[in-house]
A protein has these predicted regions:
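Residues within the helices of the helix-turn-helix
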Residues: 10, 29, 69
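Short, charged recognition helix plus adjacent turn
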Residues: 72-77
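DNA major-groove recognition helix of helix-turn-helix/homeodomain DNA-binding modules
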Residues: 55-70
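Residue-level signal for the short linker/turn that defines the boundary of a DNA-recognition helix
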Residues: 7, 25-26, 52-55
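Short polybasic/polar patches that bind polyanions
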Residues: 14, 33, 62
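A short, Lys/Arg-rich alpha-helix, primarily the initiator
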Residues: 1-24
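Short alpha-helical DNA-recognition segment
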Residues: 19-44
Length: 77
C-alpha cells in the first residue's frame, strides 16, 4: 500500500500574500529566506515533487502559524 502526501502550501502562501500589508514576506523567495532554504526548495514542495523533512514541515507550520495537519494531508493511493 502506497500513499501520497499533499500540501496546501502554495494556496496558503498566495492567500497570505494577498492579505498581507507586506506581501514580499510571502513570496517564494521571502518564505525560503525565513525557512533557511532555497527558493527552488519552496517551489519543489509546492509542486509536490519534494517532501520536506519533519523539521522543515514544523518550520513551515510555524511560519504560517498553523498546525502541520492543516498544511499536509496523507492520502491512500
Amino acid at each position: 500500500m502506497t500513499g501520497l502526501i499533499v500540501n496546501r502550501i502554495k494556496a496558503i502562501r498566495e492567500q497570505r500574500m494577498a492579505q498581507s500589508s507586506n506581501p514580499e514576506h510571502w513570496t517564494q523567495e521571502g518564505l525560503a529566506r525565513r525557512l533557511g532554504v532555497t527558493r527552488q526548495t519552496v517551489i519543489s514542495i509546492e509542486k509536490g515533487t519534494y517532501n520536506p523533512t519533519l523539521f522543515l514541515a514544523f518550520k513551515l507550520a510555524r511560519a504560517f502559524e498553523m498546525r502541520i495537519e492543516e498544511i499536509f494531508e496523507y492520502r491512500d493511493e
